[in-house]
Curated annotation (Swiss-Prot):
It comes from Prochlorococcus marinus (strain MIT 9215). This is 2-succinyl-5-enolpyruvyl-6-hydroxy-3-cyclohexene-1-carboxylate synthase. It is an enzyme of class 2 (transferase). It catalyses: isochorismate + 2-oxoglutarate + H(+) = 5-enolpyruvoyl-6-hydroxy-2-succinyl-cyclohex-3-ene-1-carboxylate + CO2. It comes from the Bacteria.
Amino acid sequence: MTSSIECKNFLRSLQLLNLLIKIGVQNLIVCPGSRSAPLAIAAGELNKLGLVNIFNSIDERSAGFHSLGISAASGNLSLVITTSGTAVSNLLPAAVEADRSCKGIIFLTADRPLRLKDCGSNQTVNQEDFLSSVCRRVLSTNLNGLHETQENEILNLVRIIEKQISTFPGPIHLNIPIDKPLGISFLNKKNVLEVFKRIYLKKKYIFQEFEIKSDKKKFLEISKSLNLDESGIILVGPYQGSVNDLTSFNKSLERLQEITGWPVFADPVSGVYSDLRGLVVNWELVLRKNKNSINCHQLLRLGPMSSSIDLEKFLINFEGIQILIKEKNYRKLDPIKKSFEYDFGLSNFTTLLIEELSINEKNKKSLIPMALDLIEEGEQIKEILKEKITQDNQITEYMLANRVPKLWPAENPIMLSASSPIRDWLTFSENGTLTRNCFSFRGASGIDGTLSLAVGIARIKNPLLLVTGDLAFIHDINGWLIENSVDMNLTILLIDNNGGNIFNRIYKENLKEDELRKLFLMPKEINWPKLAEGYQVNFKNVANFKKLREALDWSISIQKSVIIKVDIDPENEIFEKNALLEKIIGS
């Protein structure tokens, strides 16, 4: 009986992981634990066969975010294996972000069998409930143990996962009760592997193609209010689709712009290509300067709203139609509640629009006068920024947002951490992110998992530049404990403002200095060179943009993880930025 259970645990683990690989899993993160041993051992064997990449992480929280970074950068499903108990609870922050950013990730969590539940058994908790509020599906193998799960039950579970990911991507929790024995002898492992390779490895399985059918009636209801002969603006927020669909997304956006002639405001993480006609540079500053004089009555909004107070005010006060087009995201996405929402994506919307209006495929409108005016406004602001921001300036956060896209090679990816970096880049980067893949996890917009996410992205797309504040970075320092993270071609631009500088901008005028520091800034006196040395990560401190350029070139050349620290004076930052904004708005 003992031999039978250990062999069935191992065989079912092999079958499950093999099927998940067949629906797109290429990368797997395994965390330590005994209860998950059959899954981990099976993953190791499939890795030996060259079927899946495996990386380990001793911290489940980091593992979840690492897997999410891989999913975002690759466009493929990623997978995390954990043991039971509190290990599962540590997956929640990554599950929250995966839910809100619509990224496919599977959490395989080992559990105790039903007979050990609700009786005080060690390390036995209600883990099947921990992720239920944010996961697309919560599934389970046989509650009495994996060894009692039938082959067809495993296949059905994988088909459910595949259908869910195809229609509405996000996190999926598959809880797997496993009874002892958890390990397997060398002889039994050899015998089970022979059976698996002979019968199951090359077996063909049928997975249904799921086509998302659009709602023509809903499209007609929404689009009838559009008048393409009148002025409008296309607003492109953070991209929530798969990176694998970016090309078709941009082709549809290009066609939409051609048939309207409208200007385009693109978020730094919109995924929009830099050569799109009609792009308005410095559009947030243009909005701030011309908030009451932009004359149009229709907006096409793609994806969630950018993190911009000026844009939010503009949308709230906008008197006209707003259409919000979403990419495989069926929840409400409009916090100001003024738009008609269309769930079926830009490609579908553009195709139906062309069909409905019988637009000639070769039809291409000239840029409308308003577009030309807004583009010219953006270029004028660009000249002011060029005059005020030079390589001789003392480094500030807003200057980094403007200069770094020009210093980092145009084709190399960038990740922006949450909090102040994404806001500064929205305002000052001058569309400098649009020549490359640019990532920022705007689903829940937390600072959680910053380093682990970056390491995950760098496994797929590198050399990667992570731009992060000091608190966001130190919050996830366990990311360095992910297997071979220090060997990634990853450059970390560490903005050291000795605390959460975004709170300086929000609360400085209303709090005493000691209150501000204790309650919001929370500065940490960290010896950064020693910290980097402890993790065997290369480190440099730079004081000006000339040295920063040299350091960035050096970081790419050594092809390993590097920390480049720049020190920011928050007082100087606020003073200089306010003076610059006054000059721009008053020009």
